[in-house]
């Protein structure tokens, strides 16, 4: 059985020193490309906007600190995006990676067993054109074989964490779709052209 580490809180306080960052409450812009309807989510980072295309047909709900996404008809599957504003630049070095690895294992459900780090990948998906690091962990919980991934990136003064959890049999396809959506995330500087888009996107999403 996995024991939750009592040092995780210290790690997060010292290694991942951060404060509230991007507001992940989404505005929504619907558009059609090649006959297919898509949704673009627009977040706010001070005067800049951040644009993100979620995987097709995934539902979502956002708050200031977190965006949650769920694929259709998949039990035990969920993705989240978190953004924190960094007090100072933090390189993606082994100290940070090991701290996040401990955090990821500590976050597993109580009673989880057989946790194993399956992969550690550098730059598996660029985030806003910059470097990233990915951890993939397998484990068993609630009678299911599950896989959890975390993609971490420091972009400008923001630390981003993209998590995905799914059954082992569902993970590969969902992981591919989620990483493709991560690739779409990018910052947009203030301009008249983009401010028009942002105004249109203030309409609430039809759920």
Please give the residue ranges for each predicted region.
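Conserved polar/disulfide-associated segments of primarily extracytoplasmic proteins
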Residues: 22, 60-154, 160-161
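Soluble non-cytosolic domains of exported or imported proteins
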Residues: 45-49, 90-99, 168-179
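Hydrophobic h-region of N-terminal signal peptides that target proteins for export
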Residues: 11-20
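Solvent-exposed, polar/charged alpha-helical surfaces in well-ordered, non-transmembrane soluble domains
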Residues: 52, 56, 98, 102, ...
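N-terminal "mature-domain start" segment
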Residues: 25-65
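Compositionally biased, proline/threonine/alanine/serine-rich low-complexity intrinsically disordered stretches
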Residues: 21-41, 77, 86-91, 98, ...
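Bacterial N-terminal signal peptides that target proteins for export
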Residues: 1-7
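Surface-exposed amphipathic alpha-helical segments
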Residues: 58, 158-207
């Amino acid at each position: 059985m996995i024991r939750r580490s009592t040092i995780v809180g210290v790690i997060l306080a010292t290694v991942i020193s951060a404060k509230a960052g991007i507001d992940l409450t989404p505005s929504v812009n619907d558009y059609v490309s090649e006959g297919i309807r898509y949704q673009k989510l627009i977040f706010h980072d001070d005067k800049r906007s951040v644009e993100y295309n979620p995987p097709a047909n995934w539902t979502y709900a956002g708050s200031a600190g977190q965006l949650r996404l769920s694929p259709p008809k998949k039990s035990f599957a969920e993705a989240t995006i978190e953004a924190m504003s960094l007090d100072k630049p933090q390189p993606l070095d082994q100290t940070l990676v090991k701290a996040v690895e401990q955090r990821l294992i500590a976050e597993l459900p109580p009673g989880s067993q057989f946790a194993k780090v399956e992969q550690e990948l550098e730059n598996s998906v660029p985030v806003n054109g910059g470097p990233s690091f990915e951890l993939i962990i397998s484990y068993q919980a609630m009678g299911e074989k599950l896989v959890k991934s975390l993609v971490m990136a420091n972009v400008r003064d923001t630390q981003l964490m993209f998590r995905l959890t799914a059954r082992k049999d569902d993970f590969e396809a969902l992981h591919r779709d989620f990483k493709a959506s991560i690739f779409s995330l990018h910052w947009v500087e203030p301009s008249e052209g983009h401010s028009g888009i942002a105004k249109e996107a203030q309409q609430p999403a039809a759920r």
